[in-house]
Structures are given as C-alpha cells and as structure tokens.
Amino acid sequence: MATQSIYMRFPGGLSKALTLSYDDAVEQDFRLIDIMTAHGLKGTFNISSYQYIPEGYVYPPEKKWGQRMTMERATELYSRDGIEHALHAYTHPHLETMSSSQIAYEIIKNRESLEAQFGDIVRGMAYPYGTYNDEVIRVLHDCGIVYSRTVKATLSFDLPGEWLKWHPTCHHTDPHLPELTAKFVEKFPKVDQHPWLFYVWGHAYEFVRDDNWHIIENFADQISGKDDIWYATNMEIWEYTENFRRLVFSLDESRVYNPTAQTIYFTKGNMLYSVAPGQTIPITN
C-alpha cells in the first residue's frame, strides 16, 4: 500500500489561495470592489435581500456610512466579474433564536429572491451576527446551502473542517493582519503539506466609520499580483476543494480518475500532478 500522502493543490498547481467576504450590501461596497478589481482580488458579498431600500430613497445627510443599496444598484455591483453574491438570511436575524420553520423561511426567501434577482444559483452564505447553532446548520443543509462563514478568527491558513462552520483567518481590523499578510506573501507550504487559504472578512462601512480605508488599500497592494496565489471567491474555493475530494484513486494509489468537469492538481511525494476532466492518469511515485 502507498505510504506517501496526497495533498490538494489549487488551480495551476498553486499552493496558496486568497478570498474575501463582506456583509450587508452597503454603498461602501462600491469603493471596496473598485479596490479589489484594480488589484485582481476576488470575493463574496453577503446580502439580506429584505434590507434593500426603495428606488429613489435618499438618506439624510448626517448618515455617513452603512447606507443600504437599492436592488438595482446591488444588481449592477454584485454582477461584476470576480464577485460572488451569497445569502446573509432574508432579514438579518439571530437565526439561533428562531424555530426551524422560521430559519427555513429566512434561508429559502433569501435564496429565492437572490436567484431571481441575479438569474443564477446561490448556495453560499455568511451567518448574520456570526451566530448559529446545530439546528441552524441542519436547516441550512436541508435548504441546499453548501457553506456558511462565521466570524471566529483562526489566525491560520487552514481550509475549513466543516463548510457550514467556515471560520475565516481574520477580520480586516485584526492586529495580526500585517504579520499574517507578510507570512502569506513571503512563505509557502512545503510539497508535503496542505495548501494555504487566507480568508479576510468584514463590512465595508467600517472603513468609513473607523476612517481606515488605508487598511484594505495597503493589504491589496501587498497581496495582489502574485503568481503563486489563486485569487478566488468563496464558492470557487468550495467547488474546487469538493472536486478534489471526488477524485477516485486505485487501491494502491497508482492511478487516479477525475469524474469532475474541472482539472484538479495534487502532490504526492515530490511530484505535482494534474488530471483533466474525465481523465485517468498513472501516479508514478
């Protein structure tokens, strides 16, 4: 039997990936997405679709941050390339305080409205307030949600152990962000280690409230344009990882078959392999 472990690699054989996640569909997302797009970064924006404001509504001038969007502006913004739209529950409640039927309504109504708005399939989510319990997770699973982000910082680059408890690396104001960024840019996992995922989250209105747009601007400057980093949305991370897990290996791990529609990369020993959709290849070490 084989003794060497097999480790996933991201598209192109890369060992590092970066994803961002921002909540609440606020006007400050326009500036954030402009920064992301200019630097080639990708991310996921989590929307409570009940909270859109009516077309033509004007906020009072003293409202400086946290302004909600109209549906029309949200459709324009979150349809841009490199941006995923995901659920944040329909009315942004504390889901763990609700009955099973109320939780299901929040998820189904949010998913139904976003899928109608954007004309696609929406299966990702971030928990409103970051709170949940086992019953919330069960209902999410039954409603077809495949991942949901929490607010619990890991301060690590580990992939999630449970997709419906997807803990991020850190919030953008975490004091560890600079050292984590430096480590992620300058170092990399060894060939016999799991790949790294750097996951940063927040709310774009915080950049105005806290007067710290420089945090995300500096972060984008430092981490963008690296040919050894895969820049991806949350769903792209989930889909690729799940496709890797669908690879079929012979008992002695001398052959591998890829039943998915995506080319998958992995290492074994000191070798990097890629297996195309529908292909079976030998593993020589």
For the regions a language model picked out, list residue spans one by one.
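C-terminal domain-boundary segment and adjacent tail
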Residues: A2-F10, G40, E115, Y147-S156, ...
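Active-site metal-binding loops of divalent metal-dependent hydrolases
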Residues: Y22-A25, A89, A204, N234
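Metal-dependent polysaccharide deacetylase catalytic core of the NodB/CE4 family, i.e.
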Residues: T37-V146, A153-C170, W196-A204
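Catalytic-core region of carbohydrate-active enzymes that cleave or remodel glycosidic bonds
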Residues: Q117-F118, R138-K152, P178-Q193, E217-I223
